[in-house]
Amino acid sequence: INIGSKLMLSSIASMLIMGTIRFFVQQQWSIQTFGKLSFTLSISNMFLTFINAVGIVMFPLLRRTNRDRLSSLFQTLRGVFVPLTYAILIFYIPAKIVLGMWLPEYEVSLRFMGILFPIVIYEGRMSLLINTYLKTLRKEKTILMVNVLTLTLSLLLSLFVIFIIGNLNLTVGLILASLAFRCNLAEFFLCRDM
């Protein structure tokens, strides 16, 4: 129960990182603006669903791996995964062209996509590599701490950026910055513990 509750709270905090920003955008700007941002996030989530499915398969494999080999295996997987996810960004331009012709009224969404598409890199690395490894090493408390810290930081910064500065592009950039911070912080703790 102790491990499960930490993972559940961690998962809720992780969802709220983007969820609170989406909520504040909905409160501050029009429903059309919110819809365009949500469209972009939905496309990013489509890629993340595939990556999460691979992460679910990896966990049992890592649990059976000798603990002494986990560090070298992490370096190998990271060496494959990071360039692969950066390569996915190449598809941004063709996707923008095709979607621009198909949905011309969503031009703003396509601009957001350029900022938010890198979410796939950070969220993918987080769910496929870092969280899977932290769970394998029984570091659920670290996952929870990183997600709660990122949620707190994201919440405070989003209140400032959305309601005081009032800049939508900065708000969209804040989503990416929050997820990049979470990924890098979790990876720091993972590398320190391995």
Question: Could you say what each language-model-derived stretch is?
Answer:
Residues 15, 42-45, 120, 150-152, ...:
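Residue-level recognition of pore/gate-forming positions within transmembrane alpha-helices
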Residues 120-148, 188-194:
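Membrane-interface junctions at transmembrane-helix termini in multi-pass inner-membrane proteins
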Residues 44-68, 130-136:
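Helix-loop junctions and terminal segments of transmembrane helices
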Residues 110, 138-141, 151-184, 188, ...:
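Membrane-interface helix-loop junctions in multi-pass transport and translocation proteins
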Residues 1-10, 68-85, 108-114, 136-144:
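Membrane-water interface at loop-to-transmembrane-helix junctions
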Residues 2-3, 7, 24-45, 107-111, ...:
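Interfacial/gating helices of multi-pass transporter permease domains
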Residues 51, 74-124, 152-164:
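Alpha-helical transmembrane segments of multi-pass membrane transport and lipid-handling proteins
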Residues 1-18, 57, 61-71, 190-194:
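Interhelical loop/hinge segments that connect adjacent transmembrane helices in multipass membrane
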